[in-house]
Amino acid sequence: MLARQNMIRIFISGLILSGWMASHADTPATPIISIIIDDLGYQYKVGQRAVRLNGNITCAFLPNAPYAGRLAEQAHLQQKEVMLHLPMEAETENHLGPGALTQCMSEKAFKTLVHSNLAAIPHVRGFNNHMGSRLTKSPRLMGWLMQAAMFRDDLYFVDSRTTTESVAQLEAERRRIAATRRDIFLDYDRSAGIVADQLTELVRHAKRQGTALAIGHPYPETLATLEAWLPTLEQQGIKLVPVSELIRIRLQRRIAPWQMSSSHSPRVAKNSKQ
């Protein structure tokens, strides 16, 4: 009887352990971060400085910016992942520049502009919203956006979360476009002290959640802080990866291990801006 009870205890312990291992098998042992530098393409020297940052920084370029194509080529040569930073109508301060999506556009014009904006940036792997606090709240318009993006089967989407009411990530996932959202804004305040504090929060978030995604801008304060901070990542035990890799890890963590082989994978595995 005692032997049978011991066998039952061992069996139950095994089930508990195997369940724990299944739930933790895809959790990165090393905290993973990604950093997107937005708003690239208008200032050539500033863009070069961003492209030359140490490690797997992801570079997001505004469509039709005078140096966007040239800098995107340089980013690709530097083995940086390239994104389209897609202008979208905001609630206020709509200084969006060329290529902006607005709510007054017809469906055809809207989708045509999405296609031309994506075509304007070489080596583009994904896209995120520039401003967009008005547009990203609209399921209809975000549906148009994601339908237009489906002509490429390898694009991902990052919701910059310029409003807490955004439905952009949801609409992307409804169409099986790999998507995620920003966790940290590095430079809602441009002071170097704030950027450093936000980088500390980025690491804290990654250690707590396994992954963390930050967005910054090519401000002198942000670039200088990153230039000093990025070489310290290995010492901190943090891994910087392209956004596509972070999304792949996050998607794996959302799918139970026993679902991996049967599930249909998606098409690729304080803020002041609105």
Task: Tell where the protein language model's regions lie, with residue ranges.
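N-terminal signal peptide c-region/cleavage motif recognized by signal peptidases
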Residues: 20-24
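Alpha-helical scaffold elements lining the catalytic groove of polysaccharide deacetylases
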Residues: 97-119, 136-141, 170-207
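Hydrophobic faces of well-ordered beta-strands that scaffold small-molecule active sites
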Residues: 33-37, 57-60, 80-86, 127-129, ...
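Active-site beta->alpha N-cap acidic-glycine motif
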Residues: 27-94
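Bacterial N-terminal signal peptides
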Residues: 10-19
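C-terminal domain-boundary segment and adjacent tail
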Residues: 149-158, 162-163, 218-274
